[in-house]
């Protein structure tokens, strides 16, 4: 059983993608599971955070600032190309895709993956919360700009998106906090002090929910590609742009983490539990791994959900 679980953990990404691609006829109809699965992924991720114990790092703010700068830069370059092209270059879809690649929050499974690589689960979980909060605040203002409509005013479109996006990002955090307060309050009334923690199985739950969701998403992506209305060169440009954005974010994240490492010593208990060798990593090594995953690992499920709104 342990060997089977290790195999699934190692090759889960490939297995999920293959199942989703070849089983697209069946799994494409499970799109309604997207929102509940995203909610649960965020809920279990936030359950690992005690809001009173949040530790902010320098690289948290630097990564967020660079992320926003890249988004604004892509928007500026995109609109400049549209202007000089005199409306002949249709790059609106490419522009939307690039912005989504950049602005999407960190994947909920990223802390688990970072832990397996030797990074800091604590620091990345904290950044995941910050990243989701940033997305909830920024995305509603970006979408009306990326997809302007003559029928809906800017602030009306912004409000509609805010009502759809923010609850999915904020409610899991609030629910996790309520569960923690109720659990710890119950034990205090009994005269005992017990902190709310997740065991290894429940702490890994976002990873397995992500795998399940990835199957559904790959099925829907396959269905979309088979019925695509764009020309081949346009698809190539979108894929190339996404690849460049992915490599750039991983590289920048790793550089920022190495250049501005966390200022605390030692390894978190969860890090050692998942990867015993993490205790031997230096602060710079742990921060490089953690920041790289924080910037490069994106919540693809949330991005596709937003793109289909």
Residue spans for each PLM region:
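Alpha-helical transmembrane segments of multi-pass small-molecule/ion transporters
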Residues: 1-309
């Amino acid at each position: 059983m342990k060997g089977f679980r290790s195999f699934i953990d190692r090759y889960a990404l490939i297995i999920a993608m293959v199942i989703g691609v070849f089983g697209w006829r069946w799994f494409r109809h499970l799109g309604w599971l997207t929102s509940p699965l995203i909610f649960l992924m965020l809920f279990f991720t936030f359950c690992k955070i005690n809001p009173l114990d949040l530790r902010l790092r320098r690289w948290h703010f630097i990564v967020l600032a660079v992320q926003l700068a890249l988004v604004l830069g892509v928007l500026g370059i995109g609109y400049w190309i549209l202007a000089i092209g005199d409306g002949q270059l249709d790059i609106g879809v490419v522009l939307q895709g690039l912005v989504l690649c950049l602005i999407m929050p960190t994947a909920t499974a990223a802390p688990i993956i970072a832990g397996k690589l030797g990074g800091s689960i604590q620091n990345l979980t904290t950044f995941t919360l910050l990243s989701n909060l940033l997305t909830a605040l920024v995305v509603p203002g970006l979408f009306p700009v990326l997809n302007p409509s003559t029928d809906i005013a800017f602030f009306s479109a912004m409000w509609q998106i805010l009502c759809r996006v923010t609850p999915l990002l904020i409610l899991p955090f609030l629910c996790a906090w309520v569960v923690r307060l109720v659990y710890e309050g119950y034990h205090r009334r009994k005269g005992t002090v017990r902190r709310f923690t997740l065991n290894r199985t429940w702490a890994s739950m976002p990873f397995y929910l992500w795998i399940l969701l990835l199957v559904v998403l790959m099925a829907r992506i396959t269905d979309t590609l088979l019925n695509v209305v764009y020309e081949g060169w346009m698809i190539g440009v979108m894929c190339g742009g996404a690849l460049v954005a992915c490599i750039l974010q991983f590289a920048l994240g790793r550089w920022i983490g190495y250049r501005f490492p966390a200022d605390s010593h030692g390894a978190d208990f969860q890090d050692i539990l998942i990867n015993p060798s993490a205790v031997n990593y230096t602060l710079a090594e742990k921060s490089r791994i953690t920041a790289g995953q924080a910037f490069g690992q994106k919540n693809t499920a949330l991005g596709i959900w937003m793109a289909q709104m």
